[in-house]
């Protein structure tokens, strides 16, 4: 997230040090299972105290009230009690974008960052999540004023990001629903598709294009520069690889994802990183419950767009 560390693998399919799946392309060995008895596996969380979250939320609300940010993605680390290993989670997770760096973290993201193919660049900002068991859940989230405002802000930010690197930028699909099956049931997530036309020899400047859009708008906020300063003040810890990006380039096409749905190891303990968008209309208790609701294992059928 801070652009201070990264990996560049020259032969991604020919190595096993870092395992990945990006849009159906993977170097993961087949048939990997779990150790022990499935029924004996446990996964529970030790959430941050609400009072601690309140302090972080207050810093963000103050910045929003000053006009320094219209929307800010506030993230937290939730401690886990689990006997799942990072490797087991990676191999069992059903997600279109997976990444495992042994001993450090596992990521199982449903969110595309950018795709580049045949002169087109596409981004798919994801903003808005609801439990599918909520009565009339799709209508509820699509008609929710706060959710709509957040999504509009992020789509506008992504459109501006693409305008810096592409021409004829357009919102091709706006606020469509993905239904995702996770370990505790189903959730609905709201995304949009923003596209643009790349010009010239864009292959020679892929890195410039990608780095010019970082950090991703959906996990930072708008406007970016002042929002990032507030994030540093409120979160009081580095995100590291969490909310960064990873991807695969086959020589013609680039596919990449935002590193959300992320479990890391620190000092022998597991932490699940999650976050949510804060605006002037946000309620602290509701936002706290949302970041905890995002702590799950994707042992269902997550769909790609």
Name each model-derived stretch.
Residues 1-305:
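Extended alpha-helical targeting/anchoring segments
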């Amino acid at each position: 997230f801070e652009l201070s560390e990264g990996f560049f693998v020259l032969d991604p399919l020919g190595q096993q040090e870092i395992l990945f799946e990006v849009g159906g392309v993977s170097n993961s060995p087949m048939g990997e299972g779990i150790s022990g008895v499935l029924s004996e596996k446990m996964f529970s969380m030790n959430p941050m105290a609400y009072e601690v979250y309140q302090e972080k939320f207050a810093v963000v609300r103050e910045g929003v009230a000053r006009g320094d940010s219209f929307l800010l993605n506030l993230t937290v680390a939730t401690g886990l009690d689990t006997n799942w290993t990072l490797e087991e989670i990676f191999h069992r997770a059903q997600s279109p974008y997976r990444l495992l760096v042994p001993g450090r973290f596992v990521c199982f993201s449903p969110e595309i960052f950018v795709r580049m193919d045949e002169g087109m660049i596409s981004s798919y900002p994801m903003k808005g999540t609801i439990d599918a068991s909520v009565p009339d859940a799709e209508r509820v989230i699509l008609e929710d004023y706060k959710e709509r405002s957040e999504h509009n802000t992020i789509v506008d930010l992504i459109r501006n990001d693409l305008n810096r690197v592409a021409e004829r930028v357009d919102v091709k699909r706006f606020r469509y629903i993905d239904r995702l099956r996770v370990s505790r049931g189903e959730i609905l997530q709201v995304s949009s598709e923003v596209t643009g036309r790349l010009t010239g020899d864009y292959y020679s400047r892929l890195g410039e294009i990608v780095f010019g859009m970082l950090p991703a708008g959906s996990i930072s906020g708008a406007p970016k520069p002042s929002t990032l300063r507030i994030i540093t003040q409120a979160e009081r810890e580095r995100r590291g690889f969490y909310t960064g990006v990873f991807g695969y380039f086959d020589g013609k096409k680039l596919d990449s994802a935002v590193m959300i749905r992320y479990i890391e190891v620190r000092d022998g303990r597991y932490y699940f990183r999650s976050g949510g968008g804060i605006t002037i209309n946000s309620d602290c208790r509701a936002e706290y419950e949302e970041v905890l609701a995002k702590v799950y294992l994707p042992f269902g059928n997550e769909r790609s767009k």
